[in-house]
């Protein structure tokens, strides 16, 4: 929360520090204040998709360039090439993932959506789309804090949101994401890796499949408190909360926070 107010005060200080302007030059348009933008990748994938490991590597390379905390990837296992968990098999398919797969009319995998702009894109288009998304401006900021209690596997999530402009209507989405999941993955030539390590896997939508409707105001930051119990089998030291604010124009800001800081 303190960081959000620092950003606001910085903008005010800039305005107060301006020199007086001659009347002939008073109507020069000044760019609106903006906040550092992060980018969300919704990576649609599946354990039976032989080309998906290559797509995962492509995302890793992009994150190496931009930073994993700025280019935030979420692997959504969904569709006919995704597999569900059974008593004897670790599957990563989820109902919420299938909901998104159907809603966005994903034709096949691997495909990815970037900040919910441009539709579902093939791997070859990803670098250009990432570059385009980072060049967009935003006036929305999000800070995320997590407090985990081991005894009951409960996490207290504090989400602080702010905007530098007029009121903005949208939805706050909270996702549970997990790293380091050992589960089978199919490769080209039907090669099966039974101990493939899957990262940033979507496990659950914490506050509903489409999030919670909010209105952000420049007058004050908005604080959202959420209590969530981790599902059975989730490793808290490998888990993240991903939070993003979006509306009909796309994702305006995204951030992530580890449930247990190490």
Identify what each model region corresponds to.
Residues 3, 11-40, 44, 50:
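Bacterial Sec-dependent N-terminal signal peptides
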Residues 12, 65-68, 106:
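Alpha-helix termination/capping residues and helix-transition junctions
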Residues 33-39, 54, 61, 91-94, ...:
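Membrane engagement elements in two modes
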Residues 44-55, 73:
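The canonical Cys-X-X-Cys-His
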Residues 51-67:
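Typically the conserved alpha-helix immediately C-terminal to a functionally engaged Cys/Sec
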């Amino acid at each position: 929360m303190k960081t959000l107010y620092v950003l606001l005060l910085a903008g005010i200080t800039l305005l107060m520090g301006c020199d007086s302007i001659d009347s002939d030059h008073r109507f020069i348009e000044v760019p609106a204040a903006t906040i550092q933008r992060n980018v969300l990748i919704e990576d649609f994938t599946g354990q039976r998709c032989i080309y998906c490991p290559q797509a995962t590597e492509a995302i890793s390379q992009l994150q190496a360039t931009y930073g994993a905390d700025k280019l935030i990837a979420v692997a959504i296992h969904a569709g006919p090439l995704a597999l569900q968990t059974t008593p004897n098999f670790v599957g990563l398919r989820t109902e919420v993932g299938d909901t998104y797969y159907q809603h966005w009319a994903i034709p096949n995998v691997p495909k990815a959506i970037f900040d919910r702009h441009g539709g579902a894109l093939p791997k070859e288009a990803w670098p250009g789309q990432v570059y385009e998304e980072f060049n967009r401006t935003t006036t929305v900021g999000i800070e995320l804090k997590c407090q985990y209690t081991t005894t009951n596997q409960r996490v207290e999530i504090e989400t602080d949101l702010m905007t530098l402009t007029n009121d903005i209507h949208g939805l706050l989405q909270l996702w549970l994401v997990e790293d380091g999941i050992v589960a089978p993955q199919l490769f080209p030539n039907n090669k099966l890796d039974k101990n493939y390590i899957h990262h940033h896997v979507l496990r659950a939508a914490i506050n509903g499949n489409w999030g919670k409707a909010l209105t952000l105001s420049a007058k004050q930051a908005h604080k959202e408190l959420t209590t969530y119990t981790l599902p059975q089998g989730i490793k808290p030291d490998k888990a993240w909360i991903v939070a993003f604010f979006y509306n009909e124009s796309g994702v305006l800001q995204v951030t992530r926070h580890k449930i247990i800081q190490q």
